[in-house]
């Protein structure tokens, strides 16, 4: 009986402190445990950053400055807008590629319940070869997005949600002890929590499918579903067919289904979507690739407020599936444009927890 009471007390203490406070980066965090990560307004309880990292110091110094009403750089709460890319910024994008690209391959090539169009199956083979062998060419983003929309077209929103959630349970290829849906970067989840504690309104602006983003991030971080911007497909009524939405009446026997590709939310399209959907210039931007460059510059150029852009460098080849060549190229871009580099190798105490390792 005493041992049971002791176990109960320990469990209660663990939940009260938060999982990460009780077991600092000792194992891979589940989604429920990721959701417990909480950084206070003063930022005194960051656990997963090296405190001597210039990027960490720049962020904390900035937030203290712009949230201080006595500072000349004070930013009113309504103007504290922070935008985050997802893949490679908040979650792993190298297992061995983006979450949604790997899910597309599963749907087009391996799903026994689905027969894709011949052209989608053949293009999925091209994408798979690019991911595993030849490298992804610049024109593949748009083509993949169109084919991805095609293989999921006709699904109701609940059906698509179930498919995404199922794929989230698959192992993160190339890593040990990690699922795709759990592969969030612990230090970056802390950043989101810290900014939320300081009354920043946080948006995700990603090249991934908008609905997939909502499902993938749900419950992990304090980001509302309507604050998620991503690649879009048409949403149609199930009996609408080719009828224009101006000429169709949604009726009781209809359901909303997924349709064709609309827009890939990368590069300048990120800026266009921010201007249209947020309606004001961000003051903080976080990303990791050339697809975020326009978003970075839009944030820091001609801003009436003090603004910063942070770019993660994929330079950790021991704890993560990094790429030093890409990291060096992004560091050079940071120096050129005035973005702040974040070294995953040097600035993060851990990425997923010490029990998560690269597969040999």
What residue spans do the PLM features occupy?
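Positively charged n-region of N-terminal signal peptides that target proteins for export
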Residues: 1-5
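Electropositive phosphate-/nucleotide-binding environments in soluble metabolic enzymes
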Residues: 53, 154, 268
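Short, solvent-exposed loop/turn and secondary-structure capping segments
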Residues: 93-96, 101-104, 215-216, 298
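Non-catalytic pre-domain segments flanking phosphatase-related domains
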Residues: 6-86, 94, 101, 108, ...
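Solvent-exposed, charged interface segments at domain starts and junctions
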Residues: 11-13, 145, 220-226
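A metal-dependent, Asp-based hydrolase signature
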Residues: 96-98, 102-182, 186
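C-terminal cap/substrate-recognition subdomain and adjoining C-terminal extension
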Residues: 29-50, 64, 162-360
């Amino acid at each position: 009986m005493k041992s049971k009471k002791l176990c109960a007390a320990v469990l209660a203490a663990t939940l009260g402190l938060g999982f990460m406070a009780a077991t600092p980066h000792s194992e891979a965090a589940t989604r429920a445990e990721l959701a417990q990560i909480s950084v206070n307004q003063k930022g005194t309880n960051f656990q997963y950053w090296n405190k001597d990292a210039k990027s960490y110091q720049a962020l904390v110094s900035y937030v203290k400055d712009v949230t201080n009403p006595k500072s000349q750089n004070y930013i009113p709460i309504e103007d504290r807008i922070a935008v985050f890319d997802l893949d490679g910024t908040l979650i792993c994008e190298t297992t061995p590629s983006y979450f949604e690209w790997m899910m597309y391959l599963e749907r087009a090539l391996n799903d026994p319940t689905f027969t894709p169009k011949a052209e989608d199956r053949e293009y999925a083979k091209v994408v798979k070869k690019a991911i595993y062998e030849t490298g992804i060419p610049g024109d593949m983003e748009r083509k993949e997005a169109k084919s991805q929309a095609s293989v999921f077209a006709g699904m109701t929103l609940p059906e698509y949600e179930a498919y995404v959630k199922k794929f989230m349970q698959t192992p993160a290829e190339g890593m040990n002890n990690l699922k795709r849906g759990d592969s969030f970067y612990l230090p970056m989840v802390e950043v989101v929590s810290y900014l939320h504690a300081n009354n920043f309104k946080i948006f995700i602006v990603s090249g991934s499918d908008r609905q997939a983003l909502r499902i993938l991030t749900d419950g992990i971080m304090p980001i509302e579903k309507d604050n998620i911007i991503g690649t879009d497909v048409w949403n149609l009524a199930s009996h609408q067919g080719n009828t224009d939405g101006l000429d169709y009446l949604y009726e009781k026997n209809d359901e909303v289904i997924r349709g064709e590709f609309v827009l890939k939310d990368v590069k300048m399209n990120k800026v266009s979507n921010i201007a249209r959907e947020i309606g004001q210039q961000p003051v903080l931007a976080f990303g990791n690739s050339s697809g975020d460059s326009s978003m970075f510059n839009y944030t820091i150029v001609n801003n009436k407020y003090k603004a910063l852009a942070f770019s993660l460098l994929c330079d950790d080849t021991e704890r993560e599936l990094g790429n030093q060549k890409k990291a060096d190229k992004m560091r050079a871009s940071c120096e050129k444009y005035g973005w702040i580099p974040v070294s995953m190798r040097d600035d993060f105490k851990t990425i997923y927890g010490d029990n998560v390792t690269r597969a040999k």
